[in-house]
Design a protein with these regions (language model features):
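Acidic, proline/glycine-enriched N-terminal capping motif
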Residues: 1-211
Length: 211
């Protein structure tokens, strides 16, 4: 296990990506990583956006190969207060899998869909399955956790947007979304996210609940 602290304000910008790349010298992430973000109070940003941009910085800095090859598991957390930054911790997939979710699951759903970036039809089908599973319950509120297992062979990160963007039936719509933006859920409420690579042919699985 190796830890590396990157100070600064985590964002989805190129400036943050460059800061992470500059701090990545000598670090090798391997098959699993945990990213613990600290943000100023009231900062409104999706955890998966922070995670993806930070991983890009780690890749740029040589800590990860192209397309995040070999990365099979990720945990990303965010909290308000304290000195802004991210702590990068290298782990093993077994360690990540052994972590207990920080609360009971309000929804546990599987699907035979294979999430692919740019496939709006898949995203719509996944959203329909989530709506059917959630039924007419009110959206989840507060600090949330999500656990995603995806049967993908390529990048573990690229398909994640497809999975999370369809969560509007469960999380409600983010008021920042404009009318033309079809997918804009309140996924900024997710403060603990685990993403794992599932076996080829396995089902896509999402569990989500309140922390």
């Amino acid at each position: 296990m190796t830890r590396r602290l990157v100070a600064g304000l985590p964002t989805g910008t190129s400036a943050w990506r460059q800061r992470v790349a500059g701090a990545a010298a000598g670090l090798q992430v391997g098959a699993a990583v945990q990213l613990d973000f600290v943000l100023p109070p009231g900062r409104w940003v999706d955890g998966d956006t922070l995670a993806e941009n930070t991983l890009k910085g780690l890749r740029d800095g040589g800590a990860l190969p192209a397309r995040y090859g070999g990365l099979d598991a990720l945990v990303a957390t965010k909290r308000d207060g304290g000195v802004p930054g991210v702590q990068v911790t290298t782990l093993t997939p077994k360690t990540v899998e052994g972590r207990r979710a920080p609360g009971p699951a309000a929804l546990d759903v599987t699907a035979s869909l294979l999430p692919r970036p740019g496939r709006r039809d898949v995203k719509r089908a996944w959203r329909s399955q989530l709506a059917a599973a959630w039924r007419d319950r009110p959206p989840l509120e507060g600090s949330l956790w999500a656990d995603v297992a995806m049967p993908v062979s390529g990048s573990l990160i690229a398909p994640l947007e497809v999975v999370l963007d369809a969560l509007e039936p469960v999380l409600g719509r983010d008021p920042r979304g404009r009318a033309w933006q079809e997918f804009f859920p309140n996924d900024h409420l997710i403060t603990w996210l685990r993403v794992r690579r599932g076996a080829t042919g396995a089902a896509l699985r999402l569990r989500i609940g309140v922390r």
